[in-house]
Amino acid sequence: SPYPDREELVAMPALHLDVALIHMNRADSCGNGQFLGPDLFFDDLYCMAADRRFMSCEKIVPTEELLREGSIHTLKINRMMVDGVVEAPGGAHFTECPPDYGRDEAFQKEYAATARDPEAWEAFRARYLEVGSEREYQEAVKSR
């Protein structure tokens, strides 16, 4: 260890990702992505580690609007780091995308509970995951 406590540290090669899927608060159509919450959640690192990178966002805005809601430091994803952008409001559900929305704890608990039971998992999949579109998924989530 390079530290005074001589703790034994382990090093390993970085994982190589085929594809990274990230979600940001705002983006422009060129692939510049902005986070408005307190934590970037390593999305920039995922993009740098992957061969192909796709970004969903709460809202696609004109490039000049990206700095209206946050400083230059909130632009952590640049257009050279992504291969595609899609607007997907609620796309980080059931996790959070602050300040747009927080974590859906009730849904996360439902997910965790059903994952333990094959029959419950099948019902969960049918209700939420095997729907035809993102809109249908969001409607199923709101209907609970």
Regions found by a protein language model. Name each.
Residues S1-R144:
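Conserved phosphate- and dinucleotide-binding cores of soluble alpha/beta proteins
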